[in-house]
A protein has these predicted regions:
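Membrane-proximal lumenal/periplasmic loop motifs of glycosylation machinery
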Residues: 40-53, 57, 64-84, 92-93, ...
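Short helix- or helix-capping micro-motifs
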Residues: 23-26, 132-140, 144, 164, ...
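Transmembrane-helix motifs of polytopic, lipid-linked glycan transferases
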Residues: 103-124, 157, 161-165, 353-357
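Membrane-interface anchor segments at the N-terminal boundary of transmembrane helices
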Residues: 100, 306-372, 382
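Membrane-embedded glycan-lipid processing machinery
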Residues: 75, 79, 90, 97-107, ...
Length: 419
């Protein structure tokens, strides 16, 4: 490497370290603020009630070496284990200190900023990666969700890891050794499985993105088939322990959870609005009458029957869900403060705007487009059926920031030339 190239690399590394330091400080400050707020009477675990309490209780059961189940009758396959395992690690180290857990999650959120840089460097160059990392470091929604007891940020971290391995698998890099490429495909599949154990939807979205990238990549048809096979093998191996456990517990082969049915019915039922309202689970009391597997299937049947009988209502609900998914301001009632909504709006609007510009600039780079927008668009498709929220878009904004960085960099270059 020439001296100028070495100096540029050193400068880029310093900028990255500074960016990550800022990201960590921002998140730790927010951890203090959020902890102070939730400690106020009536004290609670998280700003957004619901999922956090379940995750925390599952983690407590893991630490105590008890059944991975919550509620009565016990629901053994309600959640995938990825996020509860991370919470259990924190509880094992720091006890029930929620603030310490927020600090650990802040570190994971900071690491996700670093992975965004890595993805940008792999797809474009170091400068683009740095711009994307700066955005993720300062994004108010990304920073805030990093310290909530929710799985979005951990999912973003694992999602980015799997995307990076996919890019390294298919990107032209002079590596022609079949064994090495197959190994990378196996690792990519394993990381897709790991991300699925944090958020089940990645089993479908991640595999589809990987398959499209492999098809679009270089190589013969036989080579691509081998890559796909190794990738799927990696997914299967990484998820096998969870699937076997579920089979032993329920008597059925379940790769993810038995909560898809109730979640689908949440979005497709006579009282649905596009927002989540799971009170029907308590009023129907199906878990007292049927097995967990049967409840999942029953709610799936009810949801699809409602969809078949009410196509117009389903279309209206799909529109409402997309409004919530693509919203530029927070959906949750806890975040209705006008000042917060303005801050989020001013952060999200440039991201989406520059991402559109970056997509236009990258129109002849299909691999870049798939890697940066695939998750965002496929999640949007899923939330035509399931309830919508800005929260579900958040993990996909990390790779999207790379595409936005392409647009930002091009704008700077044009302004520089004009000057």
């Amino acid at each position: 490497m020439c001296r100028s190239g070495l100096l540029e690399t050193v400068a880029a590394n310093r900028c990255l370290l500074f960016t990550l330091a800022v990201a960590l400080v921002v998140r730790l400050v927010l951890a203090v603020v959020i902890q102070h707020r939730v400690d106020q009477p009536p004290s609670r675990l998280c700003l957004i009630a619901g999922d956090a309490e379940g995750y925390w209780e599952l983690a407590q059961h893991l630490v105590a070496m008890e059944d991975f189940a919550i509620y009565e009758p016990p629901r053994y396959v309600l959640r995938v284990p990825g996020f509860p395992v991370v919470l259990a690690m924190s509880q094992a180290l720091f006890g029930s200190n929620v603030f310490a857990t927020r600090c650990l999650l802040a570190c994971i959120g900071t690491a996700a900023c670093g992975l965004t840089y890595w993805l940008g460097r792999e797809l474009v160059d170091e400068t683009t990666g740095l711009i994307a990392a700066v955005y993720t470091a300062l994004s108010p929604t990304m920073a805030l969700f990093s310290v909530l007891i929710l799985s979005e940020t951990l999912f973003a971290f694992t999602l980015l890891l799997s995307l990076i391995t996919m890019v390294r698998l298919v990107w032209p890099n002079g590596t022609n050794a079949t064994g090495r490429v197959m190994g990378r495909a196996l690792v990519a599949g394993g990381l897709i499985g790991l991300a699925t154990l944090v958020r089940p939807t990645w089993l479908y979205v991640g595999v589809l993105i990987a398959a499209v990238m492999i098809v679009l990549g270089a190589g013969t048809r036989r080579f691509k088939i081998l890559c796909l096979a190794c990738m799927l093998l990696g997914v299967g191996l990484s998820m096998a322990p969870w699937a076997v456990r579920n089979s032993l517990v329920t008597g059925h082969l379940v790769f993810t959870t038995l909560w898809a049915g109730p979640s689908l019915y949440d979005g497709l039922n006579p009282q649905a609005t596009g927002d989540s309202d799971m009170r029907f689970v308590e009023t129907d009391r199906l878990f007292e009458q049927l097995s967990e597997y049967e409840v999942d299937r029953e709610y799936s049947r009810r949801a699809w029957r409602f969809a078949a009988e009410n196509p117009g209502r389903v279309l209206w609900l799909a529109w409402k869900k997309q409004q919530r998914y693509w919203s530029l301001v927070p959906n949750a009632d806890q975040f209705r403060d006008v000042r917060l909504q303005v801050v989020v709006f001013l952060a999200v609007l440039p991201l989406l705007g520059f991402a559109i510009y970056g997509a236009w600039l990258s129109q002849h780079k299909p691999l870049t487009l798939v890697a940066t927008t695939g998750a965002l668009l496929l999640f949007a498709g899923l939330h035509l059926l399931f309830v919508g929220s800005l929260r579900y878009r958040l993990p996909a904004e990390y790779p999207l920031s790379v595409l936005a960085a392409v647009g930002v960099r091009q704008l700077f270059l044009r302004l520089k030339r004009a000057a």
